């Protein structure tokens, strides 16, 4: 059941789920500990992770080096029994624990049910350490205690588009765009990708349970808003980018039990606390901010919200609902 209601935010949707214990984000295991015969999917390793064709009905892993940044492992699942050329493509961004295998296994039954391809790049901590290099997109570098704007082709954000091109070629796909999904830190990646990659071929953004947000606000200092904090005028995002961003098709998914104000990984800076005391409230604040900016600018807001009942900070719990929104 989906119920539209006002109060929390004008565009927020309530998605009823049966009450059940969902796997918590904290229970995630590192990729290298996932057994080859994992219950929900069969892993196929191709040599030293060379670029290979995707394999229907199996979870595969390969190394992708077709961008200007460091080579990254990529996990993928192609559903069986579907026309792969026509199948929608979804990119899945993992959380701060850098656990794409776990995330992907939680998505396999839904991808098979709805018939879409899932591609999960792995931004390992050894190469993309901390939030600046991963969920903030590695837009800014730091040297000798000074920040600088990095070459765009080396941003973490910049791995996605060439990886999509690679997938289209390997699959023989006719798809011209994709869905971009992320949970937790991956959700932070997704909503900031929307700002920094306006020309990307994303059909729909699915941002789930982010811990904190870059608000569409030119007066708030980055990374909590668009205002330049480093004296790098060329890096500042302004009104035009806000206008573009709030018109994009984005669904903000929030578990109604993701309300632990003392969660060990929840950011508690003064700026983050202004967004709300926990993830659920911060997500609602972000959605409200997008609609407020759209109203101010006189444009139609493309942002919607989905509240997932009886789910806390769980990628698997969110996936049951998010899968229905893949385009």
Locations of regions flagged by a protein language model:
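Alpha/beta-hydrolase
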Residues: 91-93, 208, 254, 308
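Alpha/beta-hydrolase active-site loop
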Residues: 140-171, 178
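The feature captures the conserved acid-bearing segment of alpha/beta-hydrolase catalytic domains
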Residues: 203-292
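C-terminal catalytic histidine-bearing segment of alpha/beta-hydrolase fold enzymes
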Residues: 253, 264-267, 284-327
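Short substrate-entry loop that stabilizes the transition state in hydrolases
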Residues: 82-87, 92-129, 215
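C-terminal segment of classical bacterial N-terminal signal peptides
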Residues: 13-21
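Cap/lid segment of the alpha/beta-hydrolase catalytic domain
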Residues: 124-154, 265-266
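A domain-start/cap signature at the N-terminus of enzymes
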Residues: 23-89, 101-102, 113-114, 145-148, ...
